[in-house]
Curated annotation (Swiss-Prot):
Cysteine amide: modified positions: 18
GO MF term set: toxin activity
Lineage of origin: Eukaryota, Metazoa, Ecdysozoa, Arthropoda, Hexapoda
UniProt tissue specificity: Expressed by the venom gland.
Similarity section: Belongs to the poneritoxin-Ae1 family.
Organism name: Anochetus emarginatus
Residue stretches spanning the membrane: none
Protein name: U1-poneritoxin-Ae1d
Record key words, sorted: Amidation, Disulfide bond, Secreted, Toxin
Length: 18
């Protein structure tokens, strides 16, 4: 999957960016 949450984007290092 490439989605973390609504309005958030997956980071290349792991985790999410909102």
């Amino acid at each position: 999957r490439s989605l973390c949450s609504n309005g958030c984007r997956p980071k290349p290092f792991g985790g999410c960016s909102c």
